[in-house]
């Protein structure tokens, strides 16, 4: 299966030698054979399920390993990367010396040497002008399958002239014995070198490290060119109107952007340039815990031949128990985006977004179901990236847990968060886009805002009804909230009205305002952040 132009000798430039065979851009049928062939053991082995998809296990790493993420600090990155050891904000961009990088690289290249290797060339980014051409090198068939699903698959013609911009070498089977002496976190590593344009993976089998690794790189390169790089879902209406949905896990990002009246551009990673909004990916990576055909027919229907399940429980008859989270609650499936019917074709991109929606699930019962944001408030709430979860009852704790994640994706930011906020607002202002804060969480009744009301709110945003509505100002947070919207229970629009005693809201609002102010302090080390404090909550 050696395709013209790629031989074992071509991989020697990366330090990999004595390769017995290169399996280049394998077909799905060949990957199926390789994943299920007799003799495979451990985490290399794929299991055929009754749905037609292959299931694999990723071992102890059932999610990303943020404590093992490093970026080489050199002349290219020293003054651009948002470093973990600088400033007030916490992030995962730990610096790595060029010397330690060389050691890690030699571990991975030795691991891959002397083997049959799978090489997948793919694009990250649907826009030809700004996409990254990525070459993935691995000895494990299902890892090649994962990136074939998740990244954009080139045509045969595009492959003939494919010169990679970035190399990902996945040495999941190797670990670093010298990590303590090198001052690293553990024997596992996910390391990036922006001068060499290489990502190295060692010790972790989790497929998402390759997906989110390239997202972190797009988050480095694009904003420096004035292009927004966003952790969001996006869809488009029949008239070409584009909406983007930001939100942390559990806020309804996937649910609310999956709309039978609108076509999906993508579910997780997007850019926004002079032409409009475009998907970075060629697939979806959906959570499957408690998945049912009735509740999420699109995702369930996508789990068929060529889909790849991770860490699910497969029963003796080949059926999948999606309710069993004994391996992890973070069970996943990757599949090519065309497994979903209602998508933008043939390329996952559309025009400029006119509606930008920040989803939050406020468990404190303070924020309104919807508010219209000013450009300054847009930056403030984008940088705050707030959501909150109800505490687990098993520990008997009733206090909600707040989460603040810059730009609704702090784990993947390579530059300072204010750079993403500035680029987003510039893009919005250039095309007259409007931002809204939508709370899918709880209010004074103690119940979660109904999905019916939330969907009606999203409809009012998308069809423009909200922009015609009368508004009032919610105190403390100074948010413009509508007094009435079609199809929405008017009694919930002002969160104070959901409390039997409005003084209760006042107390909770002051408490949450303090948390916002305290969190935002980390951005006051830049002039942009300092200026935005004036639009934050005021007690």
From Swiss-Prot:
* Cofactor dependency: Mn(2+)
Q: What is its main location?
A: cytoplasm
Known Pfam families for this protein? PEPCK_ATP
Residue sites binding ATP per the record: 212, 231, 247-255, 296, 332, 448-449, 454
What are the UniProt keywords, alphabetically?
ATP-binding, Cytoplasm, Decarboxylase, Gluconeogenesis, Lyase, Manganese, Metal-binding, Nucleotide-binding
Give the UniProt entry's GO cellular component terms: cytosol
**One GO biological process from the UniProt record?**
gluconeogenesis
* Top EC group: lyase
UniProt keyword Transit peptide present:
no
State how the cofactor is bound: Binds 1 Mn(2+) ion per subunit.
Enzyme Commission code: 4.1.1.49
* Pathway membership, UniProt: Carbohydrate biosynthesis; gluconeogenesis
Q: Which GO terms describe its molecular function?
A: ATP binding; metal ion binding; phosphoenolpyruvate carboxykinase (ATP) activity
Q: Where does the chain bind substrate?
A: 64, 206, 212, 332
Tell me where in or outside the cell this protein is found. Cytoplasm
What reaction gets catalysed by this protein? oxaloacetate + ATP = phosphoenolpyruvate + ADP + CO2
Q: Which family does it belong to?
A: Belongs to the phosphoenolpyruvate carboxykinase (ATP) family.
Q: What does this protein do?
A: Involved in the gluconeogenesis. Catalyzes the conversion of oxaloacetate (OAA) to phosphoenolpyruvate (PEP) through direct phosphoryl transfer between the nucleoside triphosphate and OAA.
Q: What is this protein called?
A: Phosphoenolpyruvate carboxykinase (ATP)
Organism, scientific name: Proteus mirabilis (strain HI4320)
Taxonomy of origin reads: Bacteria, Pseudomonadati, Pseudomonadota, Gammaproteobacteria, Enterobacterales
């Amino acid at each position: 299966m050696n395709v013209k132009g790629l031989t074992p000798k071509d991989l020697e430039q990366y330090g990999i030698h004595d390769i017995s065979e290169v399996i280049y851009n394998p077909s799905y049928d060949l990957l199926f054979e390789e994943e299920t062939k007799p003799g495979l053991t451990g985490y290399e082995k794929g299991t055929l399920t009754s749905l037609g998809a292959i299931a694999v296990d990723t071992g102890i790493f059932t999610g990303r390993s943020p404590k093992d993420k490093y970026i080489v600090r050199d002349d290219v990155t020293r003054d651009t990367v948002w470093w973990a050891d600088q400033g007030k904000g916490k992030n995962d961009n730990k610096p790595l010396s060029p010397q330690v990088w060389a050691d890690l690289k030699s571990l991975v290249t030795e691991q891959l040497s002397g083997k049959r290797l799978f090489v997948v060339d793919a694009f990250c980014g649907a826009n030809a002008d700004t996409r990254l051409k990525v070459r993935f090198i691995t000895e494990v068939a299902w890892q090649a399958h994962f990136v074939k699903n998740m990244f954009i698959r080139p045509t045969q013609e595009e492959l003939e002239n494919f010169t990679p911009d970035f190399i990902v070498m996945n040495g999941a089977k190797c670990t670093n014995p010298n990590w303590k002496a090198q001052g690293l976190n553990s024997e596992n590593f996910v390391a990036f070198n922006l001068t060499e344009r290489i990502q190295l993976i060692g010790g972790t089998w989790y497929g998402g490290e390759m997906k989110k690794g390239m997202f972190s790189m797009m988050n480095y390169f694009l904003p420096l060119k004035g292009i927004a790089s966003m952790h969001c879902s996006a869809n488009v209406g029949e008239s070409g109107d584009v909406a983007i949905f930001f939100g942390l896990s559990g806020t309804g990002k996937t649910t609310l952007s999956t709309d039978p009246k609108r076509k999906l551009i993508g579910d997780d990673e997007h850019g926004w340039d002079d032409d409009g909004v475009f998907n970075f990916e060629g697939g979806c990576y959906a959570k499957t815990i408690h998945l049912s055909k009735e509740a999420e027919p699109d995702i369930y229907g996508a789990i068929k031949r060529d889909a790849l399940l991770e860490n699910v429980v497969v029963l003796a008859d080949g059926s999948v128990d999606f309710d069993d989270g004994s391996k992890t609650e973070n069970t996943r499936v990757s599949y090519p985006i065309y497994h979903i019917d209602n998508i933008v074709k043939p390329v996952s991109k559309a025009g400029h977004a006119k509606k930008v929606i920040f989803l939050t699930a406020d468990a404190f019962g303070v924020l309104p179901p919807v508010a219209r944001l000013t450009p300054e408030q847009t930056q403030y709430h984008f940088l705050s990236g707030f959501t909150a979860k109800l505490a687990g009852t098993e520990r008997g704790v009733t206090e909600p847990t707040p989460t603040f994640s810059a730009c609704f994706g702090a784990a993947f930011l390579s530059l300072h968060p204010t750079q993403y906020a500035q680029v987003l607002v510039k893009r919005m202002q250039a095309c007259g886009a409007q931002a809204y804060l939508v709370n899918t969480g709880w209010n004074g009744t103690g119940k979660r805002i109904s999905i019916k009301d939330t969907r009606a709110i999203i409809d009012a945003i998308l069809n423009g009804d909200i922009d015609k509505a009368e508004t009032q100002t919610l105190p403390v947070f100074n948010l413009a909230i509508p007094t009435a919207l079609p199809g929405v229970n008017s009694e919930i629009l002002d969160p104070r009205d959901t409390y039997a005693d409005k003084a209760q809201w006042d107390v909770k609002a002051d408490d949450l305002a303090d948390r916002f102010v305290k969190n935002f302090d980390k951005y006051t080390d830049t002039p942009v952040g300092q200026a935005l404090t004036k639009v934050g909550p005021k007690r």
